[in-house]
Curated annotation (Swiss-Prot):
It holds the Pfam family RF-1. Essential peptidyl-tRNA hydrolase component of the mitochondrial large ribosomal subunit. Acts as a codon-independent translation release factor that has lost all stop codon specificity and directs the termination of translation in mitochondrion, possibly in case of abortive elongation. Involved in the hydrolysis of peptidyl-tRNAs that have been prematurely terminated and thus in the recycling of stalled mitochondrial ribosomes. GO terms for molecular function: peptidyl-tRNA hydrolase activity; translation release factor activity; translation release factor activity, codon nonspecific. Down-regulated during the in vitro differentiation of HT29-D4 colon carcinoma cells. One of its GO terms (cellular component) is nucleoplasm. This is Large ribosomal subunit protein mL62. Changing G89S: Strongly impairs peptide release activity. The gene is MRPL58. Its main location: mitochondrion. Component of the mitochondrial large ribosomal subunit (mt-LSU). Mature mammalian 55S mitochondrial ribosomes consist of a small (28S) and a large (39S) subunit. The 28S small subunit contains a 12S ribosomal RNA (12S mt-rRNA) and 30 different proteins. The 39S large subunit contains a 16S rRNA (16S mt-rRNA), a copy of mitochondrial valine transfer RNA (mt-tRNA(Val)), which plays an integral structural role, and 52 different proteins. It comes from Homo sapiens (Human).
């Protein structure tokens, strides 16, 4: 057995292999197909986004894609990616994973006019000088998740602004009136107590 090992070692040193040499990476060898091409999953990026051509700086709608009527029209949005901030991780400051979505709020006809006005008042800090509503997300290390988060933020804004306040019932009006009366009564009581304390501290100068 030892002699056989020595013979194999000597032949390998001389450049002659009795058996085919082992693969450098077993995982890569398993992923190789019979025709020599590398196996790729159906969820690989080049199969999910065949028209992207490796571009990670901007997002565009693939050709032939249909947009649902109840969803956000992606062709009216300006979507871009940039470096994600924050400490730690190998992808930080190396991959464009932070998503930024912006659109002109005043001309967004896919949102009702009253809803747009309410969004402009409620989220005025997210609107720039050009009237663009800007939303960003860097909660994930993946671009598509951050993009989905930005779109969900837009949906939440529209849903929140679309809700109309409910009319108060008679019981609510009565309860509100009682609370105001109790609050005024307590305020006057505290005022009388404070006035009595100030009067007790007063010293007569004879």
């Amino acid at each position: 057995m030892a002699a056989t090992r020595c013979l194999r070692w000597g032949l390998s040193r001389a450049g002659v292999w009795l058996l085919p040499p082992p693969a450098r990476c077993p995982r890569r060898a398993l992923h190789k197909q019979k025709d020599g091409t590398e196996f790729k999953s159906i969820y690989s990026l080049d199969k999910l986004y065949p028209e992207s051509q490796g571009s990670d700086t901007a997002w565009r709608v693939p050709n032939g894609a249909k947009q649902a009527d109840s969803d956000i029209p992606l062709d009216r949005l300006t979507i871009s990616y940039c470096r994600s901030s924050g400490p730690g991780g190998q992808n930080v400051n190396k991959v464009n994973s932070k998503a930024e979505v912006r659109f002109h709020l005043a001309t967004a006809e896919w949102i009702a006019e009253p809803v747009r006005q309410k969004i402009a008042i409620t989220h005025k800090n997210k609107i720039n000088r050009l009237g663009e509503l800007i939303l960003t997300s860097e909660s994930s290390r993946y671009q598509f998740r951050n993009l989905a988060d930005c779109l969900q933020k837009i949906r939440d804004m529209i849903t929140e602004a679309s809700q109309t306040p409910k009319e108060p019932t008679k019981e609510d009006v009565k309860l509100h009136r009682i609370r105001i009366e109790n609050m005024n009564r307590e305020r006057l009581r505290q005022k009388r107590i404070h006035s009595a304390v100030k009067t007790s501290r007063r010293v007569d100068m004879d």
